[in-house]
Amino acid sequence: MVLGAVLILATAGGVAWRRRDGRMRESPVPRLTEGDLGQPLGTRATLLQVSSAFCAPCRATRQLLSDVAGRSDGVAHVEIDVTTRMDLARRLDIRRTPTVLVLGPRGQVTRRASGLPRRADVVAALAVATGEAAP
């Protein structure tokens, strides 16, 4: 009986975690600047990727974000390593890699995702950040 309850709880927890993994959600973090990132912001939006050296999903995320940014005028893809920027990781409450933050033209964080995001979610988050879609 107890084993069955534990299995049900573990399964429910796994399903809930899987549903949130890589999903874009609103973020309460204030603005970030070029000084914070050490690189220029995009004129329309910035895809900020927080990665680590031994993170397998980070490579796929890098390819996805680079491709989306390359196809979108004024969108920059900036990647920072969590091990060299612990100060920023703490400020942004980074708990796992990859974490993706979508910044508007003035560096305001509009969306974030932990884990590998879906392309459609990144494109939709960019539309919100640039004001091309309703939030």
What kind of region is each of these model predictions?
Residues 1-31:
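N-terminal targeting signals for export/organelle localization
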Residues 25-44:
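Membrane-interface amphipathic/juxtamembrane segments adjacent to transmembrane helices
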Residues 41-53:
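Short active-site neighborhood of thiol/selenol oxidoreductases, capturing the structured segment around
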Residues 55-58, 100:
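The canonical Cys-X-X-Cys-His
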Residues 59-71:
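Typically the conserved alpha-helix immediately C-terminal to a functionally engaged Cys/Sec
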Residues 73-87:
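Thiol-based oxidoreductase modules, predominantly thioredoxin-like and allied folds used
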Residues 93-101:
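Structural micro-motif
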Residues 102-135:
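Non-catalytic, surface beta->alpha helical segment in thiol-disulfide oxidoreductase systems
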